[in-house]
Amino acid sequence: MTIYLFLTDRMKRGGYVYIMSNPKNTATYVGVTASLLIRVSQHKDKINPDSHTAKYNITKLVYYQGFHHIEEAIAEEKRIKGMSRKKKHLLVSALNPEWKDITDDVIE
């Protein structure tokens, strides 16, 4: 019974879809997470040196969107990943025209 309640509670957890970029805004990464600040810190700290984000110095959080359910965030991640580079650029630019690192603006 406890395990079932734990799984049910986790399924109701919210989540975030996010886009990160390198300093010159020539490489991006789209991801999804339940804990945005922790995940962004992992990218910035390059905890996996062989990863795409570490290899291309993708350390700036330039876009994020929160959802009440992690499944919604996953669906949005898939939608964004299916976009062309130009459409991703327009998505970020609409909310963050200067492509600044907005990590300090995150409210979880």
Task: Specify the residue positions occupied by each region the protein language model found.
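Residues at or immediately preceding the N-termini of alpha-helices
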Residues: 36, 69-71, 85
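GIY-YIG nuclease catalytic motif and its immediate N-terminal context
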Residues: 1-48, 54-64, 75-78, 91-108
